[in-house]
Amino acid sequence: MPVKRSLKLDDQFEKNSFSPSKIVRKKSITAYSPTTGTYQLSPFSSPATPKEQEHRNGPSNETRKRSNLSSPVRQESTVKDRDGFMVLLSKIEISSEKTMEIMKNLSSIQALEGNRQLEDLIGVSLVPCSLKSEARKTKELMTKVIKQKLFEKKKSRITPKDHHLDSFEFLKAILN
């Protein structure tokens, strides 16, 4: 017995007209790595455009430019940084003195002195002159570091008597 079959294409077309299309986009060739033979997992893992790449490398390029400066300019900047740091330390000492005076004058703080709640509230313990002593210690360490660096610079310089222009004199100095 023959069976009649009819294709009902119109009905299926109407049902699927509002569903999302199944068109698959081709993968970009820029996302393919010939070295590893793989595709990029995330489109956001590395910049695709050259402008984004420049923006990404911006700070490192600036760092490289700064490192290429001549040594006198670098020395001036480090001296300025050290001087600025010392100025800040002296300001901290002055402000710590003022802070300690204010804390002594406040009667409510004096009543709570030694209480753990006050230390938790302020964030530091009320050890007398703790800020001042810490700033003084930091200042002393900075001066020691500066003196050490200056000593190392003087020590590392080649004096004219140590510098031999002739290879014969150099070998003679080594043997003696």
Curated annotation (Swiss-Prot):
Tissue: Expressed in the spermatogonia and spermatocytes.
Keyword entries, A-Z: Activator, Apoptosis, Cell cycle, Cell division, Centromere, Chromosome, Coiled coil, Isopeptide bond, Kinetochore, Mitosis, Nucleus, Phosphoprotein, Repressor, Transcription, Transcription regulation, Ubl conjugation
Any single biological process term in GO: chromosome segregation
Biased composition (Basic and acidic residues): 51-65
Segments forming a coiled coil: 82-112
UniProt domain comment: The DD1 domain (also called RepD1 domain) mediates the corepressor function and is essential in the triggering of apoptosis.
Protein name: Centromere protein R
Organism field: Mus musculus
